[in-house]
Every structure is written in C-alpha cells, then in structure tokens.
Amino acid sequence: MPKYVLTGVGGNVGSIAASYALEIAPPGSTLVFTTSNLDKIPSETRRVWSEKGATITTASYDDISSLQRVFAGAQAVTLISTWAFGRRPQQAQNVIDAAKSCGVRRICYTSFVGADDPSPIPEMPFLPRDHKQTEALIRASGLEYNIQRDFLYIDNIPNFFAPSWEFCGNRWLSNSGGVPGAYVAREDCGRVLAALLLGRGEPNTVYNVTGPEAVTDAQIFQWICSNIKDQGQFVTVSDQEMKDYWLPRGLPTTVSEVSQLPMKLCIDDLVCCGEMVARGYMAKTSNTVETLTGRKPLSFEDVLEKYKDVF
C-alpha cells in the first residue's frame, strides 16, 4: 500500500489538494494529511477527510522531527510554499532532509513562475527569488521531483486587490503595463498538486500551471464592472508610481509587518505582482491542468463569479 503525505492542508492550496487526492487516489493508497495546527482545518472538513480514509496529523516545516514522524514509509511527499519569505529555502531543506532520512523517493513542490530566471537572485523580481533557491535545493537533493510553477492566482484579485479599490478612490492602480497574463485558478493549482503527488506527472519534470488564456488586468476589470459591480476606474501606473502612492500611506515594506490598510500585501509583493505580468513572465499558457487533472483550466470569469459577493 503506497503512502503519500500531503503537507500544508490547513492552507488554501493544500485543502483543495487534499479533497482532490481523496477523489483520485488508487485503491489501497494510504493518504496522510498534515498541518502545522489542526485548528486551521474546519472540524467538518476533518470529519469528511477522515471518513474517506485520510489520516490527519500535525507537522511543521520548521520541525524536522515532526516531518520524519509522518514521512516514515512514504513514497512521495509535498512541499507547499509558505508565506515565510526569506525562510522558505530553510524550510525546504528541512523537508528534503526529513524525506531523505526516511527513504522517501519523490518530492512535489509548489514553485512560482519566474523561478527559472537566469539572473542573479538579487536582480530577480521579488516573488520568485526564494523559489529559485528552493528548486536548486530539490535538484541537488538526489530525490526524484515534480515541480509546479504556479502563475499568479486570479483569486488574488478579489482577495488582495479589490478590497483596496475604494481606498484608492474607486480605482484599480495597476502596474502590469497592459501586458496579458495567464492568471490561474487557485483551485486548479491544488488539483495539480494532488495529481503530481499521486504519480500522474513525469519524473523530474517542471510544469507551468496556467489559466486557459492570457488577459490584461484592464480586461478583467472591465468584465468585473460589466458583470458583477461597477468598480470605478482602471489606472495604469509605473512601479515607482505604485510605490509613491502606497508608501506615504503606510503600506509595510516587509512581509513581517501587518498592514493596517485595505491592501494587505507589502510593497515589494504588491509591485512584483504587476511586474511579473508586465515583464512577460505570464504570457504563455500551458496544457498542464488538463493533462494532469483531465479538466480544462478554469477561466478568470469562472473564478471571479464565485467571489461576486466580495465586490
């Protein structure tokens, strides 16, 4: 009975992956789901997962012994990137060390578009930097791997951007430069992770996980205004203009600071979201979602319709 360990199920991607893994797991598979804190998972969700045969327990990327406890006897494990910017490569090394000590054969990692940028890390955009380091650690580990480079989630727009539009004078300030980007549904990223964990990918392969088409932020905004609720004005700004607007208003400069503003991203994270699109990192689509899950990727309209009460 092969054992598969899905870590980080208390988060959005991990939770989606867990539910899909239970749908597609071959008969006789052992599924172990871990979270750093069981309270992150609704009790009803835990009940459903348990009834379907999953074991749910705690483990932390910062605690190698907790990882070794759950990795023992596993064929494959996952590493879902966290919000611990700067500390993520060490968390990855902990997972790698624990996996190797337990005889795990394969690791599946949720990376990010742009992690293959050949530039020196300090010259790369902010968001892919840790991912480039982590991918290098995984390749050097000797473990078999599957890496999925997720594009920016379309879910980020209702979750992180829309709450700030009223604060900005009913405007979406965008530094994406009018360049199209293939935003992906977070749901599809979770499903891809489950598929890779359960062996649907090719060994030692990197997959770009994208939406079905590349669209501009202005197109997305126009669709929201026409189909959900008029949000005001779409305004194109430069990276520097974005900083000049937000920094005097108190937007945090580091991830560790908690924003008191409707915009909850720190300035580097916020600017980089637009930069990734503007510089063409997200211009090309892939067939990864359909190949690995058997379902076409969700469109931005599909996703935003689910968030219509947010706008």
What are these regions (language model features)?
Residues 68, 96, 186-194, 286, ...:
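Short, amphipathic alpha-helical "lid/cap" segments that border enzyme active or binding sites
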Residues 240-311:
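A hydrophobic C-terminal alpha-helical subdomain
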Residues 7, 80, 294:
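Residues lining the SAM
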Residues 49-55, 142-143, 230-232, 294:
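A short helix-to-beta-strand connector/capping loop
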Residues 43-50, 54-75:
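Conserved Rossmann-fold cofactor-binding substructure of NAD(P)-dependent oxidoreductases
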Residues 76-80, 109:
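Redox-cofactor binding/interface segments in oxidoreductases and associated redox assembly factors
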Residues 2-30, 34-45, 62-65, 83-90, ...:
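Oxidoreductase cofactor-interface core, primarily capturing Rossmann-like NAD(P)-dependent enzymes
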